[in-house]
C-alpha cells in the first residue's frame, strides 16, 4: 500500500500553515515567551505551539486567515476540546506540572500584517 502524496493544493496549504506557525512563534518570542513545543501531537489532538513564560503555559492555536475575526471564529468547539485533551497529556508528562498554570490562546496570522495574539481565547 502506497502512502498518499498530497496534491499541489494540499501541499500549498500545508506550507502556508507551517509558515503561519513560524510567524506566530516569532510573535510569541518577541513577547517574552519561550517555545517549548511545536505541532505537539497525541491520539487525542494536536497543539500548534506550546509556549512558556515563567510558570504560565500557553497552548496556542494558530489560524491563518484574511481577517482577525475569521481566524478567531475558525477555532471550533471540537478543536478546543481536542486542544485541551492534548494539553492534559502534555502537562501530565511535565515534572513541575503541579506549579504550572495553563492558558489557551489563539494567534491570528493575516497577510502582510504582524500576527495578532489573543490570550485566554477559550
UniProtKB/Swiss-Prot annotation:
Pfam families: UPF0102 (PF02021). One of its GO terms (molecular function) is nucleic acid binding. It comes from the Bacteria. Belongs to the UPF0102 family. NCBIfam families: PRK12497.1-5. This is UPF0102 protein NGR_c36770. It comes from Sinorhizobium fredii (strain NBRC 101917 / NGR234).
Amino acid at each position: 500500500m502506497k502512502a498518499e502524496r498530497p496534491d499541489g493544493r494540499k501541499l500549498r496549504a500545508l506550507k502556508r500553515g507551517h509558515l503561519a506557525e513560524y510567524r506566530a512563534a516569532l510573535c510569541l518570542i518577541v513577547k517574552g515567551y519561550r517555545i517549548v513545543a511545536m505541532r505537539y501531537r497525541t491520539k487525542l489532538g494536536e497543539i500548534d505551539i506550546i509556549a512558556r513564560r515563567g510558570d504560565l503555559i500557553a497552548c496556542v492555536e494558530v489560524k491563518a486567515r484574511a481577517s482577525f475575526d475569521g481566524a478567531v471564529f475558525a477555532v471550533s468547539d471540537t478543536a478546543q476540546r481536542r486542544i485541551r485533551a492534548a494539553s492534559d497529556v502534555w502537562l501530565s508528562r511535565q515534572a513541575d506540572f503541579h506549579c504550572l498554570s495553563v492558558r489557551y490562546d489563539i494567534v491570528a496570522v493575516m497577510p502582510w500584517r504582524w500576527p495578532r495574539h489573543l490570550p485566554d481565547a477559550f
